[in-house]
Swiss-Prot record:
Residues involved in substrate binding: 8-15, 21-22, 60, 87-90, 98, 114-115, 183-184
Gene source species: Hydrogenobaculum sp. (strain Y04AAS1)
The protein's enzyme class: isomerase
Protein name (database record): 2,3-bisphosphoglycerate-dependent phosphoglycerate mutase
Annotated site location: Transition state stabilizer: H182
């Protein structure tokens, strides 16, 4: 059996301000740093010892991973970073407050942008300084391969090859891996290993800073699944994500 741990980054500064973040590289809030530390403690208490870890190119995920590993005294394990684990790109919505967008466009339209499976938000122009084509961390990637906006479907198509080609083989080789990433890139992995439908995945909310632990067999069949949190804490965290566009 193999242990796969998925960890959505702790609360970011823009989570706190309820803004669309996407590929904008904001850091963790103080609460987010505490969530990352608590995630490390929860894994320690559960006897989970990752042998390798994966994260995105964005500091809120990287710092969540670093804090969690440091808490576990596992700062020395191999860490692999990939842009394919980045959050969904929210295009021209990045930096805008979700509730303000509801006032302008209506809750239905904003929820379509947030939650519809295959409808991307308005794109970010390629000459915008925040476009990934203009960011040196992506200079090794062809501009045409970098997103200006993404639907959840687009995010899945970006993330899954990396999971299949790198994360899963490392899991089978080392026995236990930790993936610290983002709500939508993690939803891509969850959809794949749980074989969820489009309707099921758009309704799934992954809370910040709470490890989701799968035990799987050689074929990624799930033998057990659990969040490392008590029921009340988990419920509040999931509701917090679900209510981001509600007045």
């Amino acid at each position: 059996m193999y242990t796969l741990v998925l960890l959505r980054h702790g609360q970011s500064l823009w989570n706190l301000e309820n803004k669309f973040t996407g590929w904008i590289d904001v850091d963790l809030s103080d609460q987010g740093k505490e969530e990352a530390k608590n995630a490390g403690k929860a894994m320690l208490e559960a006897g989970i010892t990752p042998k390798a870890a994966f994260t995105s190119y964005l500091r809120r995920a990287i710092n969540t991973l670093n804090i969690a590993l440091d808490t576990m005294n596992l700062h020395y394990i191999d860490v692999f970073k990939s842009w394919r684990l980045n959050e969904r790109h929210y295009g021209a919505l990045q930096g805008l407050n979700k509730k303000e967008m509801v006032k302008i466009h209506g809750e239905e339209q904003v929820n379509i942008w947030r939650r519809n499976y295959d409808v991307p938000p308005p794109p970010l122009p390629k000459d915008d300084p925040n476009h990934p084509c203009n960011d040196p961390r992506y200079k090794h990637i062809r501009c045409q391969d970098l997103p200006s906006s993404e639907s959840l479907k687009d995010t899945l198509e970006r993330t899954l090859p990396y999971f299949q080609d790198f994360i899963a083989p490392t899991l089978f080789q080392r026995g236990c891996v930790l993936v610290a990433a983002h709500g939508n890139s993690l939803r891509a992995i969850v959809k794949y290993i749980e074989d969820l439908s489009k309707d099921e995945i758009v309704k799934l909310n992954i809370p910040t800073g709470i490890p989701l632990v799968y035990v799987v067999d050689d074929n990624l069949n799930i033998k057990s699944k659990r969040y490392l949190a008590d029921e009340e804490t988990l419920k509040k965290a999931i509701e917090s994500v679900a209510n981001q566009t509600k007045a």
